[in-house]
Amino acid sequence: MLKIILFLLFLTPVCFINNMYWMVQIMLFFISFIFLLMNNFMNYWSEISYFLGCDMLSYGLVLLSLWICSLMLLASESINKYNNYKNLFLLNIVILLLLLVLTFSSMSLFMFYLFFESSLIPTLFLILGWGYQPERLQAGVYLLFYTLLVSLPMLIGIFYVMNKTGSMNFYLMNNFMFNYDLLYFCLLCAFLVKMPMFLVHLWLPKAHVEAPVSGSMILAGIMLKLGGYGLLRVINFLQLMNLKYSFVWISISLVGGVLMSLVCLRQTDLKALIAYSSVAHMGIVLAGLLTMTYWGLCGSYTLMIAHGLCSSGLFCLANVSYERLGSRSMLINKGLLNFMPAMTLWWFLLSSANMAAPPTLNLLGEISLLNSIVSWSWISMIMLSFLSFFSAAYTLYLYSFSQHGKLFSGVYSFSSGKIREYLLMLLHWLPLNLLILKSESCILWL
């Protein structure tokens, strides 16, 4: 673990050397492969200090962070090309990655809180510094206020836990059970906003639409997983409360997931559609997680990792069209089958992954989640069937509207994709489909 953290620390000065953009990118790839070979598949903490360590649960998410961050640099080639403060951009991404690695590998609840909140700052800089429209200021304010409003109660909750148990270590707190309503809400709300749960999701589509492609990738890929990861960690000692209140969150998530799917069906903005579909997916993750069944926890973890790769890839595809056509509107992104025939393959593969078609990791996650939610209450089948149906519906809508139909007449010439873009898509799609062969790693952590 320490070698990763020091590696990232020493990568920060490299960002300021001229023409080192691709060097940093290759270095991040390199470190993600090193980390891939570091797995021990043992369900204990490999500790490096009193508050940093890594177990199977954090391993997958740290790997996802390293992978997505190296792909972010691959996707943001235009920043390098037009020299849009690229040194600061690199620095921003490396610091963000460092904070994320520290978040996922902290064993102390307070350290987790510290890095959890501080990873917001580089994300905000990404949106405000490299976003496209002037409305990005509003998106930044939304992002900041939604998250910070609930983070103070969480801090108070953490100190209460510290006061009662005398420890903040995740492993030592598993022996305790709290039966205190206020603590439950304090600790849970911060993660619900970060997930985001329906009703507190409004910052997400806004942030996605205004963010540059790298901001969208990190937001969809990792930031949404922070909430799920935090829940998986704290749900252990909040079990008694959760049995009492979980029906509220599960109902909101399932109904909200269906409503979000319906909202997806009337989007004209490519990025907004993918953002709203993220809310629907994270709704089912949240519902499965709060059932507190074995299948539910494993399924939520699986779907979190799968969704990180899948929606990140879709945002990259939307950006490829945006760079060619200068618009994200579905009225202009039509008939892309004529425009970029080879990209249609990637559109299809990633859209089908979003629908949870086999052999993707999404399928495994969704089947486990459906199992767990139905075992919690069979009435939820009503909402789940709608959710599955509309999920397929809006994905097909996204695919068919953007790829088929007449080409928009304002498009001058057809253009093929660059090798860089095909590589980017392949590196999103390949782990998504190969991880199903190593699916026991999504279960072993529990």
Swiss-Prot record:
It is a multi-pass membrane protein. The chain crosses the membrane at residues 4-24, 56-76, 93-113, 114-134, 141-161, 182-202, 212-232, 245-265, 272-292, 297-317, 330-350, 373-393, 426-446. One of its GO terms (cellular component) is respiratory chain complex I. Its main location: mitochondrion. It is found in: Mitochondrion membrane. It catalyses: a ubiquinone + NADH + 5 H(+)(in) = a ubiquinol + NAD(+) + 4 H(+)(out). GO terms for biological process: ATP synthesis coupled electron transport; electron transport coupled proton transport. The keyword rRNA-binding does not apply. InterPro entries: NADH4_N (IPR000260), NADH_UbQ_OxRdtase (IPR003918), ND/Mrp_TM (IPR001750). It is an enzyme of class 7 (translocase). Keywords: Electron transport, Membrane, Mitochondrion, NAD, Respiratory chain, Translocase, Transmembrane, Transmembrane helix, Transport, Ubiquinone. Belongs to the complex I subunit 4 family. PANTHER family: NADH-UBIQUINONE OXIDOREDUCTASE CHAIN 4. Core subunit of the mitochondrial membrane respiratory chain NADH dehydrogenase (Complex I) that is believed to belong to the minimal assembly required for catalysis. Complex I functions in the transfer of electrons from NADH to the respiratory chain. The immediate electron acceptor for the enzyme is believed to be ubiquinone. This is NADH-ubiquinone oxidoreductase chain 4.
